[in-house]
Amino acid sequence: MEKEMPQELIRFFEKSINWILPGCQLFYRDTDADIDAQKSYQVGSVIRAGFFIDVTVKAQRPTTKFRFIIGSAHCAKLYEAVPDADMVRWRLCTLHFNSYFKVMDVYKKEGVTQIFLLHIPYQAVPFFMSEHSFNFIQGASRTNLVEIVRRSLDEKLRMDVFADTTEAELLERMKQPVGLDDKGNPVPLDYMPIPEEYKDISDAVRSLANDLDPINYPEEDCHE
């Protein structure tokens, strides 16, 4: 007879899913960087952003070889908060450098490789590194997230290109692959202490992203 899961663990899983799914939206980051997707983004693995990740909610047919599609309920929508014409036109958003993602899918079609990342809370990283967490996510969402995201690329490949999202400045901001350093190596998975010079922008991004829940911080650094 299987041992029942402890109630405390069940509550933690539920809290994690409530951080991930309600309000979850898709964000896009297109790049022509040299990426070994099979090596760097193994389905089921967990990665840390490593730097502030600029993304957009405005995307149609990609003109680049790679597209990161990120499911997140805690992305800072800069275009709604900063009176900057470029940010508004690009629908620019950003994710904190201590954001963690589970690699859900790598899908290639018509020369474009799409990498699906799901934003997860820091304290749940050990659980989401396990094999059975994938089915847990799919079950909790009551839908097939991978199918939805693959269909997104299928549909967008039939659309026109948004001219705004092909501007050189935006593409440069999105060039660096998520979770990789300048040499193409994975950034450390360890939570990075906030350098003093980045504290203000870090706090602003967290606030805009409604990302103050203690579940997304180390216990010694929790924001109540």
Model regions: which residues?
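Mono-ADP-ribosyltransferase
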Residues: 1-224
